[in-house]
UniProtKB/Swiss-Prot annotation:
Signal peptide: none annotated. Its cofactor is Zn(2+). The gene is rpsZ. GO terms for biological process: translation. The keyword NADP does not apply. Part of the 30S ribosomal subunit. Contacts proteins S3 and S10. GO terms for molecular function: rRNA binding; structural constituent of ribosome; zinc ion binding. It comes from Bifidobacterium longum (strain NCC 2705). InterPro entries: Ribosomal_uS14 (IPR001209), Ribosomal_uS14_bact (IPR023053), Ribosomal_uS14_CS (IPR018271), Ribosomal_uS14_sf (IPR043140). PANTHER family: 30S RIBOSOMAL PROTEIN S14, SMALL RIBOSOMAL SUBUNIT PROTEIN US14M. It comes from the Bacteria. This is Small ribosomal subunit protein uS14. It holds the Pfam family Ribosomal_S14. GO terms for cellular component: cytoplasm; small ribosomal subunit.
Amino acid sequence: MAKTALKNKAAGKPKFKVRAYTRCQVCGRPHSVYRKFGLCRICLREKAHRGELPGVTKSSW
């Protein structure tokens, strides 16, 4: 889990817009965050398996 200080730092508006980065809304993870959902790959997978994301299905081919 992300430290509270880092979550707060990412939540504020940076002095320069290139310094802004996305964090997972659930766990605060800074890497591999899907912008469309606002979730990291791990939380996205867990929520999709539980059926909490409407329209998201496991791919099969």
